[in-house]
């Protein structure tokens, strides 16, 4: 009897030990899972553990919350702004890629998600009521099927003030109702999109580029503001994070990322070596080379391409700002906003660069990172009203520069 009792005790002790071992293995598994790094590991995780229906419900709830208020009007009263159709948690010290797009150009998000590993903020402009509805459907579809969209992207919507966007009903049949993967959504978007020439909306509504830029970079400490059809070099986000984390002395400095454009048939270069090979044979050239060479010339491309190869990202040289330079840059601190009076084509970015200069910012060109625009910018690819818009904004820019003198009366700098 005593032997039987001892055997039972030993059995229960063994069972308890086995259960504890299983629990420890589960905790170890969860710990390893939470420590996954890199896109490949994340893709494997979502392949075997697809998002639960609850996460999709949360997306719908966020959309409903953002749209239910009816949005807010911008300062001009011409546009209705819906903040946070998608929201994401962002480290306040992170570098956010801020961009803007018409609905038809959202297809470029796919390339940005691949190249930029950090958080993105996207402002979408819908020129018509139908486009506003399509934008909400696209937001729902992309966030439902693309884990990266849910994890890393904040999305906002702007439309003419006379329109209101509505919550999409995923049960209704439509172009995106039966899609089941992220790639299917982008493939479908590429087929139904009708991208036209630059800024040609086909309506009497102006594209509010500076309103969209401000909305996308809102709340960011460090932001790289680019056009949606540009692609950053591979690893740029990680290199920027490492550089900025090593030093806190970047307030008042605009870290310039050199911008290029590539012949449309070419594959996007991933690193500086690939870029230089294409640059040497004329397949890559400075951004805006065929439209406004002085707009990017101060970057000093000849100096940049001849810098010695380095592994760490750093500022390579200082460039005094001069009119009409409009660089793409990363800056922290109290960065002036883009003046939202500038719409459509002309002087919308240079006006902000001018104010940066007057406000006391210095411009330093980075040694390794870069941006590439998809396709050469050509005069014939712009809409017929381009020159008229440019002349209108040129007059506004002259007024803007006079206003800066009153805004910064003690600044020794001018544009």
From Swiss-Prot:
Q: Name one GO cellular component term.
A: Golgi apparatus
Which cofactors does the annotated protein need, by name?
Answer: Mn(2+)
As for membrane topology, the entry says: Single-pass type II membrane protein
Q: What molecular functions are annotated in GO for this chain?
A: glucuronosyltransferase activity; metal ion binding
Where does this protein reside within or beyond the cell?
A: Golgi apparatus membrane
Give the pathway.
Answer: Protein modification; protein glycosylation
Which residues are noted as glycosylation sites? 204, 300
The biological process GO terms on file are: axon guidance; protein O-linked mannosylation
Q: State whether keyword Secreted applies.
A: no
Keywords for this protein:
Glycoprotein, Glycosyltransferase, Golgi apparatus, Manganese, Membrane, Metal-binding, Signal-anchor, Transferase, Transmembrane, Transmembrane helix
- Which residues lie toward the Lumenal compartment? 37-415
InterPro entries xrefs: B4GAT1 (IPR043189)
Q: Which PANTHER family does its entry note?
A: BETA-1,4-GLUCURONYLTRANSFERASE 1
Q: Supply the name of the protein.
A: Beta-1,4-glucuronyltransferase 1
- Lineage start: Eukaryota, Metazoa, Chordata, Craniata, Vertebrata
Q: Which gene encodes it?
A: B4GAT1
């Amino acid at each position: 009897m005593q032997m039987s009792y001892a055997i039972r005790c030993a059995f229960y002790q063994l069972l308890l030990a086995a259960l504890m071992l299983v629990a420890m293995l589960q905790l170890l598994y969860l710990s390893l899972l939470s420590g996954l790094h890199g896109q490949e590991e994340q893709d494997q995780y979502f392949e075997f553990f697809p998002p639960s229906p609850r996460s999709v419900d949360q997306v719908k709830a966020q959309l409903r919350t953002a749209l239910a208020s009816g949005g807010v009007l911008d300062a001009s009263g011409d546009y209705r702004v819906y903040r946070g159709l998608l929201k994401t948690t962002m480290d306040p010290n992170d570098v956010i890629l801020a961009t803007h797009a018409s609905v038809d150009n959202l297809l470029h998000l796919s390339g940005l998600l691949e190249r930029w590993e950090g958080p993105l903020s996207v402002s979408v402009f819908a020129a018509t009521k139908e486009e506003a509805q399509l934008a909400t459907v696209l937001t729902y579809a992309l966030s439902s099927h693309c884990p990266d969209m849910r994890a890393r992207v904040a999305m906002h919507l702007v439309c003419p003030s006379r329109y209101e966007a509505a919550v999409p009903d995923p049960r209704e049949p439509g172009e995106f109702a039966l899609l089941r993967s992220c790639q299917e959504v982008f493939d479908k978007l590429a087929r139904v999109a009708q991208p036209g020439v630059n800024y040609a909306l086909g309506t009497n509504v102006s594209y509010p580029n500076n309103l969209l830029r401000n909305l996308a970079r809102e709340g960011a400490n460090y932001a790289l503001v680019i056009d949606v059809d540009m692609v950053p070099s591979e690893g740029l986000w990680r290199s920027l994070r490492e550089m900025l984390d090593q030093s806190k002395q970047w307030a008042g400095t605009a870290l310039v990322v050199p911008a290029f454009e590539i012949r449309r048939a070419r594959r996007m270069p991933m690193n500086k070596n690939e870029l230089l090979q294409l640059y040497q044979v004329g397949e890559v050239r400075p951004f805006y080379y065929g439209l406004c060479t002085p707009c990017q010339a101060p970057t000093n491309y000849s100096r940049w391409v001849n810098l010695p190869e380095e592994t760490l990202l750093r500022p390579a040289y200082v460039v005094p700002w001069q009119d009409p330079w409009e660089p793409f840059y990363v800056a922290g601190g109290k960065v002036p906003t883009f003046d939202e009076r500038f719409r459509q084509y002309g002087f919308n970015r240079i006006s902000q660069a001018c104010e940066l200069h007057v406000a006391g910012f210095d411009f330093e060109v980075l040694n390794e990172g870069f941006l590439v625009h998809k396709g050469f910018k050509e005069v014939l690819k712009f809409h017929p009203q381009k020159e008229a818009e440019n002349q209108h904004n040129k007059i506004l820019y002259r007024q803007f520069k006079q206003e800066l003198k009153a805004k910064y009366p003690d600044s020794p700098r001018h544009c």
